[in-house]
Each structure stands twice: as structure tokens, then as C-alpha cells.
Amino acid sequence: MPYYMYVSLQDDDKIAVFTMDARTGQLTPQGEVPVAGGPSPLAMSPDRQVLYVGHRTVPGISSFRIDPATGGLTQSGTIAPEAAPTFLSTDRTGRYVLSAYYQGAHAAVHPVGPDGAVGGPPIAWLETAIGAHAIQTDPSNTFAFVPHIDNRGGPNAIFQFTFDPTTGHLTPNAPPRVGQPPGTGPRHFCFHPSKDLLYFSNEQGSSVTGYYFDPATGTLSAFQTISTLPPGYEASNTCSQIQMAPSGTFLYAPNRGHNSIAGFAVDASSGRLTAIGHVATEARPSAFSLDPEGHFLFAAGSETDRLASYRVNSDTGALTPLETYPVGKRPMWVLMTHLGG
């Protein structure tokens, strides 16, 4: 089964394409695709046939058909939203592209055509607040969350919505926000693969917070916050993305400042996190990804223009450094997938 990696290079106006050896984690360059306008956030359609790209320097969202034999990209559509998207995702059906706008203070839903191409005006263009940093629907595809960081006027809150998968409309849930302790700054989040739990990375708080998710009401309640930093570290740091292993046994979050990947073991019963340590990585790791099986992890340094690779210990979750690859200027997103059946 072919494993592919897409790395957006915002300051090179390119997307780099790699294949990964499933046994060794070795990456092999497959070429670069010119993408104007500062490509940054990436998202994949559920059928893995379309890649969606957010443009940061010239606001836009584009769709690219994926060649399943080569991983190559062919642009199929583009739209120009009112602001530059910070985050993209699709709903669980793949009929809609959802986007969050950090500086634009909005969340949006865009329709896609039968071939997955973007085009036309948004179905929803909702004013939220400065600092909107992510948006995803829950596994039932009936609720959505938009975390807002605690910086530059951000409200330091998670906005809760109901989502209509028939129309694509977002409606504020009750309550509409989940407030945070001062200095937390929820940024990105991931779902537990088999439990009603969510985990948010906290940008300003340099921490991860676990939440119980009520699948009937679509609301969240926190049960744990744990630091992503080692004891005694007091220098400047912000937390970026977050990802859980497909098995649900380990969770990872990068530190920008400490320049490390923090690892956590996930309790099989309660979902509570226990720190398992840190591994040094490239400077300012804004983006990272596990491979689809959770055997390897790749972290991009947006200040070094390199990508560091690690092997994941399946028993402990510990990361063993492997190779470092030059990728291009300002890597801002790492997306891994397989294109097999």
C-alpha cells in the first residue's frame, strides 16, 4: 500500500510530495507542485482522492485531484474567501470543506462538487472572534468545534456548534462557548478513535486538555490539563498541533521554543494522559504528522526548512530519531496518507 506525504512550503509557493517506506520510514522525494499564494493548511477528502489547500499570502482555498498511482496533484478548483484560512477540514461525508480564519475572525463552510472541487460562495460564513485556529466535525457529523487562542485579542475559548450535514449550516450550540483559564489558548484538537473524548493543544498554556464529549448534546467538559513542557523549563514556548496514534494509546504535541515533541500515554480506561517524555526536534515545529499506522512521526521546522523523522516504539510511545530531510522554505503543514484501497 503506497504511503504518501504532502508538505506545504508557504514561502516557496510549493507542495513537496514524498513516498514513505512502510518498513523503515524512509522518505523518497516524488517532486514538487507549484502552488501560488502561500500554501499552508492542508486537508484530505475522506475518499483520499482530493487534497484541499489553504493559501495564506493571497487568501484562497484550492482543490487538487490526486493521482492514486503517483500521488501527483492536478488543480480542480479554487475560491477566494474574504480572509486567509488558518485551518481546513472536510465534514465526514466529504461534501463540505470547513475553514477557520485566525485574523479573519470567522468560520466557514464551502460546498464541493461531485468531483470534490471547490467553487462558489460559502454556505456559512460565521463571525466568531480573532484567533479562530481550527474547525472539525465530530464522528457523528452533527457537531463542530472552533478553538480560539488567547493572544492578540483572542477570546481564549472553544466555540461549540451544531452542524447540519444535509445543508452544511453551522448553528451555535448551547452553551456557545467553553471558557478557559487565563493564558490557555486552545489551538488544535483531535478525537479519541474509540471513546467520546477530545484533546486540545493549548498554544499559550503549553499544555493539553482532555475533554469528555457528550454525543447527545455535542458539549464538552474538561477532565485533565497536563503540561507539554518538562519540569523547570521557564523560557518562552507555544504549543502547536496535536495528534493521537490510530490505536488511541499515545498522543503527541510539539513545543515551539523548547523545540521538542511531547509524548503522552493514554489510559485505556479513563483516557487520562501520562507524560512519557520529550524528544528534540527542528526549530519551531509548527507542523507534524504520524503515518497512517502510527509507526513513524515526522515534524517540520518552520525556521530550519527541514523535516525530522522518528520511529514510534509501539510499546512505550517513545520516539527514536531517524533522519532529517531538507524540504523547502517555511514548511507549514505535513499530511500523511495512503492511496491504496
Regions found by a protein language model. Give the residues of each.
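Short loop/turn segments immediately following beta-strands, especially the blade-tip
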Residues: 18-25, 64-71, 110-118, 161-170, ...
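An edge-strand/N-cap motif at the start of beta-rich repeat modules
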Residues: 1-22
